[in-house]
């Protein structure tokens, strides 16, 4: 049975971020994920996690200057020092929070820039992260973002991500399989799951096309959950969706998994 993690950046947004941990626990979640923890001291977050009996299972490296169109910086040529700083900061938080996975964000590729140069820069920075994280058993996740959500992102398809994972060639670097993005770009999710089996170590879900609860839209998530059980997937399933209304009202789908 899947181990579901509430995404606290997107869910329970009826209350401030630090109050979402309690809300998730009351709703029956044992695991949480979020995009970025860096606005808060790690020890404060750890105390809140412990208070509510929660485990954080994933967060991202810093996004960079979002106001300038950045969305990650680990693929930007000439910014390797910044990338290493972000990777090191994420490691500090992962160790303090006991988080087993970190998503290393690549970057948006500007019009006219060389995607190959960005890719090679990303590969080098991910190898740096791999060496830093390996002694602690922390897994590195790389994620494709569909063009509808993030135009010109370096990784668009699950196969873009798989290519980078294979070129990095380290045993602690994996595909982060977000079925929302995968359906938008790749489709054929059952066969995709088989093709990526053993290469992905974190899953995220949301309906397509509206990115709501996983009980509507194009994807038959019960089939996907059964497929994950069939292949022996033991990682976490992050609920990275935008609730249709109040978060708790939309959790009927989750009741049988508590």
Curated annotation (Swiss-Prot):
Pfam families: AP_endonuc_2
EC number from the UniProt entry: 5.3.1.35
GO biological process, one term: glyoxylate metabolic process
Binding residues for Mg(2+): 143, 178, 204, 240
Sorted UniProt keywords: Carbohydrate metabolism, Isomerase, Magnesium, Metal-binding
Record-stated family: Belongs to the hyi family. OtnI subfamily.
Protein name in the entry: 2-oxo-tetronate isomerase
Source organism phylogeny: Bacteria, Pseudomonadati, Pseudomonadota, Gammaproteobacteria, Pasteurellales
Name of encoding gene: otnI
